[in-house]
Design a protein with these regions (language model features):
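Conserved, mostly hydrophobic/aromatic
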Residues: 3, 43, 67, 107, ...
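Flexible C-terminal active-site loop/helix
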Residues: 2-4, 8-15, 33, 107, ...
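N-terminal basic, low-complexity leaders that serve as flexible interaction/assembly modules and, when applicable
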Residues: 1-69, 311, 364-379
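Glycine- and other small-residue-rich loops at beta-strand/loop junctions that grip anionic moieties
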Residues: 104, 169-173, 198-199, 222-225, ...
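Hydrophobic faces of well-ordered beta-strands that scaffold small-molecule active sites
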Residues: 46, 136-139, 164-168, 193-197, ...
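Metal-dependent enolase-superfamily TIM-barrel catalytic cores that perform enediolate-based chemistry
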Residues: 125-240
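Metal- or metallocofactor-binding catalytic centers and their adjacent structured scaffolds
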Residues: 5, 39-118
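Shared catalytic-loop signature of beta/alpha-barrel
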Residues: 65, 211, 217, 228-348
Length: 379
């Protein structure tokens, strides 16, 4: 199964007014992704997703130039060999670091799709798992900085649909953040309420919200600080009283090794389209398992990442939640990839049953939605 071609498709679409949620990183104005196709000489085709990295054209160019030259001609079944070749040439020395990890993630995911198709197995079975239900929480670019009453209007139909956990966006300021959390907790006393500050907090902000987080039984506080701010994570862990979560902006097992050893973060959130692909997130999950830590992956833009994430969670022993994207009008979820991943009435999701990722990509969609330049979030 020699790799014959690798092609990246940077793609974008503008968000609708109702989908422009405000978060700690700004207000969403467009959605970006980098879809990756790998073809073999014997006619197999695999699809993956690389995160946009807020510069999808850059990631696409890296895949279509340097990384293509590194992987074309190699054995598509040798995912470890391909991963190591890119690591040696780009990640170990003088490479583009995070951009390479992101680009490699899309290629790696496509190679696992090919491996599954070659043997006729869904990815979860290929990884040693089974078709088991994976608990989901309502997340994605949604549940942002709305007034409490409007936020409750968003949460109610999600609970009615079966979700037993939701993630609220905080990071505006301690007072309005706590007001939103209190409103949701008051109406839904048994709901697992998770919160995400999208790196917008200071240690003093965490100190101010900590009593409220404990009072309202918040399940985790996600990314209060940027990923490199190890000192703030260590400080907040001493007093916050709820688990700290992070990982969507950490790359490869080498960065997760420090995250685990520091001991401040108790919920790990690698992204299969950022952290190094399926291959690397399996390693991260094994590392976390040795420390008795759950893995709750961050999901990216399209149904490719979403399908791969559910497959992986159905195959690792320390699986946590699947982050279900409940944002409005996400064409990458609803039109680019099929079939969809419906949430079951009990708030779980089943992995696709088809070979590989078990989903199909609409190439006409990619042709109709070229990349849109500029930032995806504005303040």
């Amino acid at each position: 199964m020699k790799i014959e071609d690798v092609t990246a498709f940077p793609t974008s679409f503008p968000v609708t007014a109702r989908a422009g949620a405000r978060l700690g990183i700004g207000r969403a104005v467009k959605r970006d992704a980098v879809v990756v196709r790998v073809r073999t000489a014997d006619g197999l085709e695999g699809w993956g997703e690389a995160h946009h990295a807020r510069s999808p054209g850059t990631i696409g160019h890296l895949i279509n130039s340097t990384l293509r030259e590194l992987v074309v001609g190699r054995d598509a079944a040798d995912v470890i060999g391909v991963w190591r070749a890119v690591y040696d040439a780009q990640l170990a020395s003088h490479g583009l670091g995070a951009a390479t990890a992101i680009a490699l993630s899309g290629i790696d995911m496509a190679l696992w799709d090919i491996r599954g198709k070659a043997v006729g197995w869904p990815l979860h079975r290929l990884l040693g798992g089974a078709s088991r239900p994976v608990p989901a929480y309502a997340g994605g670019v949604a549940l942002g900085w709305s007034p409490p009453a409007a936020l409750l209007d968003e949460v109610r139909p999600l609970v009615e649909a079966g979700y037993r956990a939701v993630k609220l966006r905080i990071g505006e300021a301690p007072a309005p953040d706590l007001a939103r959390i209190a409103a949701v907790r008051a109406e839904f006393p048994e709901l697992d309420v998770l919160v995400d500050a999208n790196t917008a907090y200071t240690v003093e902000d965490v100190r101010r919200v900590a009593p409220g987080l404990r009072e309202h039984r918040v399940g985790w506080l996600e990314e209060p600080f940027p990923p490199h701010d190890h000192r703030s994570y260590a400080a907040a862990a001493q007093f916050v009283g709820v688990p700290l979560a992070a990982g969507e902006n950490h790359y490869t097992r080498f960065e997760f090794h420090r995250l685990v050893e520091d001991g401040a973060v108790r919920v790990l959130q690698p992204d299969l389209s950022k952290s190094g692909g399926v291959t690397e997130v399996l390693r991260i999950a094994a590392l976390a398992s040795a420390w008795k830590l759950p893995v709750n992956p961050h999901t990216a833009s399209t149904g490719l990442n979403m399908a791969a994430t559910v497959h992986l969670l159905a195959a690792v022993e320390n699986a946590g939640y699947y982050e279900a994207d409940v944002s409005h009008d996400n064409l990458f979820r609803d039109e680019l990839v099929s079939p969809p991943l419906p949430t079951q009435p009990d708030g779980t999701v089943l992995p696709p049953s088809g070979p590989g990722l078990g989903v199909q990509v609409d190439e006409d969609f990619l042709a109709a939605h070229p990349v849109i330049e500029g930032p995806g979030f504005v303040r």
